[in-house]
Swiss-Prot record:
InterPro entries in the record: DPG_synthase, Glyco_trans_2-like, Nucleotide-diphossugar_trans
UniProt GO MF annotations: dolichyl-phosphate beta-glucosyltransferase activity
The name this protein goes by in its record: Dolichyl-phosphate beta-glucosyltransferase
The species this protein was found in: Mus musculus (Mouse)
Top-level division of the source organism's lineage: Eukaryota
Pfam families registered for this protein in UniProt: Glycos_transf_2
Positions in the Lumenal compartment: 1-7
Length: 324
């Protein structure tokens, strides 16, 4: 009996090793060698307040604003106004009290099927295209792809990612700024502050089903085991990056959908960019685009492929800054 058990154990280990090798080969063969940084001709422009086309700037240009806010939006015509009102009210008040403070809000319509762009353009007309810009993508790329398009078209010294649902209280950007400041001195002007909901975990568990709680813990384990160490909440959509950190990390980003946050932080840790995790005020907002089981399954696959593709060299990091 003992011999049989040892044989079965050996067979199990061999099958697991063979499966890992097979998955690694598939991950390597199917990998895109370079991040898909393509732009449709229509995506190289934004519409100003008069409805005229203007060319978008580049992340590699020198910054002309203190803060850029990138808002990825997919079918957000109903939730976007609440977020935009809160954000712009805060930013306008801050500018009124500090005349040196400058900002821009970039709404990236990720191929929406509703009136998201039209809703966003109303804010452009109200505040002017120097403060509010709308980029309309020709097709849906995914949240990561939309954020990257906004980041690459930003003008800020610091770049804030903020979800269109307004789940995080916008004034908490000051907490992220404090988190960045506490990381100084920044190596090569690079640092990241991540908004975190980890302090709300016990409360959220009490409101979730056992199945969703199991999925959440499983995802957290895979993130820790495969990709990112030391960050309890990788998925909060409220993140602040220095311009150099944004340029370096997003230049190497491959994942365009929900797991892009994990790859972003994985890249940052590989580049030894300091990261602060900062507790923020967050509220569950109805209308999430995340389908619990299938989205978590997709993210689990993405996590495995992130690790294997970097490990096998199918994906590599961009180490140098693009010349201006």
């Amino acid at each position: 009996m003992a011999t049989l058990l040892l044989q079965l154990l050996g067979l199990g280990v061999a099958l697991a090793a063979a499966a890992l090798i097979l998955v690694s080969i598939v991950a390597f063969i199917t990998a895109t060698k370079m991040p898909p940084c393509y732009q449709h001709e229509e995506e190289k422009f934004f519409l100003n307040a008069k409805g005229q086309k203007e060319a978008l700037p580049s992340i590699w240009d020198s910054p002309t604003k203190q803060l850029s806010v990138v808002v990825p939006s997919y079918n957000e015509e109903k939730r976007l106004p609440v977020m935009m009102d809160e954000a712009l009210n805060y930013l306008e008040k801050r500018q009124k009290h500090d005349c040196t403070f400058t900002y821009e809000v970039i709404v990236v319509d990720d191929g929406s099927e509703d009136q998201t762009s039209k809703v966003a353009l109303k804010y452009c007309q109200k505040y002017g295209s120097d403060k509010v810009r709308v980029i309309t993508l020709v097709r849906n790329r995914g949240k990561g792809g939309a954020v990257r398009m906004g980041v690459f078209s930003s003008r800020g010294e610091k770049i804030l990612m903020a979800d269109a649902d307004g789940a995080t209280k916008f004034p908490d950007v000051e907490k992220l700024e404090k988190g960045l400041s506490d990381l100084q001195p920044w190596p090569e002007q690079m640092a990241i502050a991540c908004g975190s909901r980890a302090h709300l975990e016990k409360e959220s568990i009490a409101q979730r089903s056992y199945f969703r709680t199991f999925l959440m813990y499983g995802f957290h384990f895979l993130v820790w085991f495969l990709c990112v160490k030391g960050i309890r909440d990788t998925q909060c959509g409220f993140k602040l990056l220095t311009r150099e950190a944004a340029a370096r990390t997003f230049s190497s980003l491959h994942i365009e959908r929900w797991a892009f946050d994990v790859e972003l932080l994985y890249i940052a840790q590989c580049l030894q960019i300091p990261i602060a995790e900062v507790a923020v005020n967050w509220t569950e907002i109805e209308g999430s685009k995340l389908v619990p089981f299938w989205s978590w399954l997709q993210m689990g696959k993405d996590l495995l492929f992130i690790r294997l593709r970097y490990l096998t060299g199918a994906w590599r990091l961009k180490q140098t800054r693009k010349a201006s």
